From Swiss-Prot:
Keywords linked to the UniProt accession: Cytoplasm, Nucleus, Stress response
Organism: Schizosaccharomyces pombe (strain 972 / ATCC 24843) (Fission yeast)
Stated name of the protein: Heat shock protein 16
Chief localisation class: cytoplasm
The sHSP domain, residue ranges: 30-143
Coiled-coil residue spans: none
InterPro entries, sorted: A-crystallin/Hsp20_dom, HSP20-like_chaperone, Small_HSP
Gene behind the chain: hsp16
PANTHER family recorded: HEAT-SHOCK PROTEIN 20 FAMILY MEMBER (PTHR11527)
Length: 143
């Protein structure tokens, strides 16, 4: 029996391991089937604040709903150019389009009647005032 030199894995295997090792939540929109906006949740003395990155999304394409301690942000990223002709041009697109929904468990009792949502420059900020006794359901209008 003789030993043969090992020259490494084929490129596809190396790419598979590189992608796996470098995966992070910031890259979640590059995984097929996943469209999930990035969020930050801040809990202060009187409020819980949720910031949601929604670049390229219109306010009217987003819904915010609060139900029994869970905040759901849902909507759709619409491809405005999908009907444009690409004849004669090479087309490259790394942006994702389609529906999304993200549900967050809020770590405090919330006054559902005072929840506010503001949308500006692709950032949705939902402010949830804390209260000792919480309500269970509320649809929130975005300003």
């Amino acid at each position: 029996m003789s030993l043969q030199p090992f020259f490494g894995f084929p490129p596809t295997v190396n790419d598979l391991f590189s992608d796996f090792v470098s995966y992070s939540p910031r890259l979640n929109n590059q995984i097929p089937g996943e469209l999930s906006p990035s969020i930050d949740v801040h809990e202060g003395k009187d409020t819980v604040s949720v910031d949601v990155e929604l670049p390229g999304v219109k306010k009217e394409d987003v819904q915010v709903h609060y139900d029994s301690g869970k905040l759901t942000i849902s909507g759709e990223v619409v491809n405005e150019r999908k009907n444009e002709s690409t004849e004669g041009n090479q087309r490259w697109s790394e942006r994702r389009f389609g529906s999304f929904s993200r549900t967050i468990t809020i770590p405090a009792k919330i006054d559902a009647d005072r929840i506010e949502a503001n949308f500006s420059n692709g950032l949705l900020t939902v402010t949830l005032p804390k209260v000792e006794k919480s309500q269970t359901k509320k649809q929130i209008a975005i300003k």
